[in-house]
Every structure is written in structure tokens, then in C-alpha cells.
């Protein structure tokens, strides 16, 4: 076999791991690859999740060279993953404590992809049942049907497993320390992914996942584990923000405002009901977006 097609399942430094659609008669189905120089010359980047063509296959050494990248159907910039079909935002109910502003930032980032979003509440065993119910109801008001899981008790793991098995490529993202790797260990115990504790004073997790990697959860279905980070950026364009809030989005169709450039703060002719929990966060986010989009006067 001189050429083949596969998917990039991991990327570190100058090397890519590619899992072939069809393994060679002799050798492994996963190859350690470099990139052809011409890809860089053409400005073609290669990321985890990309469908690629490989050549110069050495089945004995399990080596090859990536010679081309297939067109992408979707693209996430942070974390950088291609061809995603579901974004799973993982947030802990405690340790670290649930932070509504941080949660909103992650959800806005997920909504910007235009892909389906699943909200996952981890460490469910750390909160009393009535508190969890209240949190789930609160997030329902945000427009999200949350799934509560616990890597300690196994609660919700089977439901999550089925959700992921019905998806071609799901990306699991969220703040550091919310237990993403622990959840994946429950789903696929053979992975034995490294996990870490949450630091005490700042209540932030330590980065135990260092790079993006795809894991097969069922034939034709993969899930991406990603490094955690704690403060996603907001959009540069303030006019983009409103459609990223599901509870506001339902009020925007059909358009209820007098002017097409209404930002739904308190402008004349605005037809939006302001009695929703995240309205204050929305206004603060609008201000931040406006500051980002304003040209700098620094010389």
C-alpha cells in the first residue's frame, strides 16, 4: 500500500498520528506521520479531526507522510479540531464551584460554531439532589437541557455514552479541573487518562490534558479530549452576540425591533423582554465586545 486515507487523531510538535480507514495487510492501522513541505507552501494546515491523504507508507515502522487534506465540514478554533459534529461543554457543579459568567463564556464559544451543543454537568455527587435540580432548572432557563454525570458513582455515564455513540465526532471542552478526563476514563476505562486535583485558593484545575486527542467510543464515533482553559474570548463583533444566547435567540425570530441594528439594551423600539437571568451578563459582554472592536489609539 503506497497511499491511503485516514483521520488525524493526535498532533504533537511536528508529528501527527493518523488512523487509517483501512489498515495495510501488514502493519498497524495507526501511523506516525510528518507533513509534506508543499502543504505549508500552499498555506494548508493540518489539525486533529482532519481527513488526510497519506503516502510513502512504511508498514513495518508504521510511518508515513501526509500529502493532502480533505475539505472540512466544520472547524473549531479553540480547541483546534476539524470536522466536529457535537460540542460538549463540561462544567463542574462544584470543585471548582459553578461560575455562571465562565459558563456563559464557554457556551457562547460553543454556540459560535453553529453546531449542536450539549451541556454536561460533572461531579454530580458533590451536590445535594435538590441543589442539582435547581441548577438544572436554572440552565433550562438559559436554553440548555443539561446532563448530570459523576465519575465516582457512574451516574449519567451510560446516557452520555449513548449520546456520543450517536455522533461521528464530539469534542469535550471546558475549564481546567472539571473532570473531563475522569469522565472519559469512565466511558473508556482502558484509556487510563491522567487526572489532577483542583488547586485550593483559586479553585482552578491543573492541566492534565496537554494536547487534543481523538478516542474511538464506538465504530464510526470518536470523542476529542482537549486541554482545559479558563477564560474563552468573546466575539469581536457586538452584533453577533445576541444570536449566541438561546433564550434571546427565540425572541429574535421574527425580528421584534424597530431597527435592524438594535443591540437589545434599551434602544428605542427594542421589542426584547429584558426579564431574563443573563441580561446583565449580556450587557457586560456587549460592552467588552465593543471595546475589542474599537480601534486602538495607541501610537
UniProtKB/Swiss-Prot annotation:
<comment type="function">
    <text>One of several proteins that assist in the late maturation steps of the functional core of the 30S ribosomal subunit. Helps release RbfA from mature subunits. May play a role in the assembly of ribosomal proteins into the subunit. Circularly permuted GTPase that catalyzes slow GTP hydrolysis, GTPase activity is stimulated by the 30S ribosomal subunit.</text>
</comment>
<feature type="binding site">
    <location>
        <begin position="122"/>
        <end position="125"/>
    </location>
    <ligand>
        <name>GTP</name>
    </ligand>
</feature>
<comment type="similarity">
    <text>Belongs to the TRAFAC class YlqF/YawG GTPase family. RsgA subfamily.</text>
</comment>
<dbReference type="GO" id="GO:0019843">
    <property type="term" value="F:rRNA binding"/>
</dbReference>
<feature type="binding site">
    <location>
        <begin position="174"/>
        <end position="182"/>
    </location>
    <ligand>
        <name>GTP</name>
    </ligand>
</feature>
<protein>
    <recommendedName>
        <fullName>Small ribosomal subunit biogenesis GTPase RsgA</fullName>
        <ecNumber>3.6.1.-</ecNumber>
    </recommendedName>
</protein>
<keyword id="KW-0547">Nucleotide-binding</keyword>
<dbReference type="Pfam" id="PF03193">
    <property type="entry name" value="RsgA_GTPase"/>
</dbReference>
<dbReference type="GO" id="GO:0046872">
    <property type="term" value="F:metal ion binding"/>
</dbReference>
<feature type="binding site">
    <location>
        <position position="264"/>
    </location>
    <ligand>
        <name>Zn(2+)</name>
    </ligand>
</feature>
<feature type="domain" description="CP-type G">
    <location>
        <begin position="73"/>
        <end position="232"/>
    </location>
</feature>
<dbReference type="InterPro" id="IPR004881">
    <property type="entry name" value="Ribosome_biogen_GTPase_RsgA"/>
</dbReference>
<feature type="binding site">
    <location>
        <position position="257"/>
    </location>
    <ligand>
        <name>Zn(2+)</name>
    </ligand>
</feature>
<feature type="binding site">
    <location>
        <position position="270"/>
    </location>
    <ligand>
        <name>Zn(2+)</name>
    </ligand>
</feature>
<keyword id="KW-0699">rRNA-binding</keyword>
<dbReference type="InterPro" id="IPR012340">
    <property type="entry name" value="NA-bd_OB-fold"/>
</dbReference>
<keyword id="KW-0479">Metal-binding</keyword>
<dbReference type="GO" id="GO:0005525">
    <property type="term" value="F:GTP binding"/>
</dbReference>
<dbReference type="GO" id="GO:0005737">
    <property type="term" value="C:cytoplasm"/>
</dbReference>
<keyword id="KW-0342">GTP-binding</keyword>
<keyword id="KW-0378">Hydrolase</keyword>
<dbReference type="InterPro" id="IPR030378">
    <property type="entry name" value="G_CP_dom"/>
</dbReference>
<comment type="subunit">
    <text>Monomer. Associates with 30S ribosomal subunit, binds 16S rRNA.</text>
</comment>
<dbReference type="GO" id="GO:0003924">
    <property type="term" value="F:GTPase activity"/>
</dbReference>
<dbReference type="GO" id="GO:0042274">
    <property type="term" value="P:ribosomal small subunit biogenesis"/>
</dbReference>
<feature type="binding site">
    <location>
        <position position="262"/>
    </location>
    <ligand>
        <name>Zn(2+)</name>
    </ligand>
</feature>
<keyword id="KW-0862">Zinc</keyword>
<dbReference type="InterPro" id="IPR027417">
    <property type="entry name" value="P-loop_NTPase"/>
</dbReference>
<dbReference type="InterPro" id="IPR010914">
    <property type="entry name" value="RsgA_GTPase_dom"/>
</dbReference>
<keyword id="KW-0963">Cytoplasm</keyword>
<keyword id="KW-0690">Ribosome biogenesis</keyword>
<keyword id="KW-0694">RNA-binding</keyword>
Amino acid at each position: 500500500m503506497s497511499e491511503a486515507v485516514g483521520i488525524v487523531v493526535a498532533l504533537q510538535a511536528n508529528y501527527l498520528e493518523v488512523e487509517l480507514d483501512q489498515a495495510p495487510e501488514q502493519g498497524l492501522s495507526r501511523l506516525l506521520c510528518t507533513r509534506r513541505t508543499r502543504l505549508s507552501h500552499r498555506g494548508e494546515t493540518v489539525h486533529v479531526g482532519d481527513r488526510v491523504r497519506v503516502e510513502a507508507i512504511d508498514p513495518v515502522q508504521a510511518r508515513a507522510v501526509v500529502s493532502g487534506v480533505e475539505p472540512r465540514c466544520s472547524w473549531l478554533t479553540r480547541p483546534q479540531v476539524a470536522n466536529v459534529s457535537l460540542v460538549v461543554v463540561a462544567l463542574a457543579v462544584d470543585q471548582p464551584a459553578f461560575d455562571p459568567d465562565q459558563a456563559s463564556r464557554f457556551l457562547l464559544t460553543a454556540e459560535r460554531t453553529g453546531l449542536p451543543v450539549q451541556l454536561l454537568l460533572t461531579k454530580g455527587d458533590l451536590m445535594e439532589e435538590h441543589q442539582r435540580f435547581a441548577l438544572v432548572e436554572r440552565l433550562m432557563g438559559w436554553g440548555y437541557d443539561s446532563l448530570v454525570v459523576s465519575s465516582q458513582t457512574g451516574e449519567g455515564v451510560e446516557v452520555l455514552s449513548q449520546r456520543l455513540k450517536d455522533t461521528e465526532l464530539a469534542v469535550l471542552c471546558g475549564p481546567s479541573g472539571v473532570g473531563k478526563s475522569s469522565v472519559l476514563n469512565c466511558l473508556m476505562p482502558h484509556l487510563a487518562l491522567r487526572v489532577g486535583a483542583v488547586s485550593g485558593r483559586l479553585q482552578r484545575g491543573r492541566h492534565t490534558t496537554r494536547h487534543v486527542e481523538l478516542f474511538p467510543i464506538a465504530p464510526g464515533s470518536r470523542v476529542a479530549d482537549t486541554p482545559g482553559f479558563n477564560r474563552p474570548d468573546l466575539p469581536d463583533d457586538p452584533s453577533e452576540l445576541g444570536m449566541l444566547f438561546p433564550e434571546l435567540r427565540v425572541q429574535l425570530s421574527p425580528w421584534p425591533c424597530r431597527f435592524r441594528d438594535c443591540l437589545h439594551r434599551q434602544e428605542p423600539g427594542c421589542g426584547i423582554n429584558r426579564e431574563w437571568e443573563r441580561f446583565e451578563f449580556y450587557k457586560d459582554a456587549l460592552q467588552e465586545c465593543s471595546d475589542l472592536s474599537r480601534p486602538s489609539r495607541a501610537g
